[in-house]
Amino acid sequence: MCAALGIELEELSDWNCCGATHVSNELVAAGLAARNMAQTDLPIMTPCSICYSNLRSAAQRLEDVEVRERVNAVLDQKYIGANIRHALDVILESLAKKDERIVLPLKELKVAPYYGCLLTRPAGLYSPQFPTILEELIGRLEAQPVALRHKTSCCGGPIFMPQEKAANDIAFAILAEAKAAGAEVIVTVCPLCHLMLDAKQKVLEQKMGREIGIPVLYVTQLVGIALGLGPEELGLFMNSVSPMPVVERAYERIAKE
């Protein structure tokens, strides 16, 4: 999908965890993030909201001279600053309004935008409670964004291990709201959110005794469909809830025009 939009990617040669697994120790977490950020002068794009939030949080901590000096004392490459961007932001910047590369406009497709709790934190780039960047992207694909009250709520993933029932209740509430709002598909910008809403959806249906059956697409998959990329290229057959009926309806709508 990035290639189709002219986005050139260069993977970090020796990346490590973003620091999320060590958040209880702010200095270690900042050091892990700084080690990643120090490896390149290019903007760093991540498709994971957890990584995005941790890298941005670390960058803010590293503005403190004392913290930066303590971290740099143990790094081979010294951290001097970084430009951290989420894939959603880069995609939107690369996709013009009425973009000619959109060969399959997703007209009439009702899409529920789900941000999750970390894309907008730390604050500064997007409104923490009322972000609209995902709705703007959905609009550029000519689909219809569906209002979702829980769009910035946690998916339940971070508490799944210690509090499975609470996590299940949270995830199911998001799915049920999207279904009730008439959404044909949910689009996510975080792999953990995608796991909770897609991979666990059938398990949640069994536990709650209610069928939802709503496909969940990661944002690159939704954009890729509009760009005319094939199901295999986009990994659509790897989704737990098949999005193929949604894709087929999109083609049928185009054929009728």
Features from the language model and the residues they span:
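Iron-sulfur cluster-binding electron-transfer modules in prokaryotic oxidoreductases
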Residues: 1-257
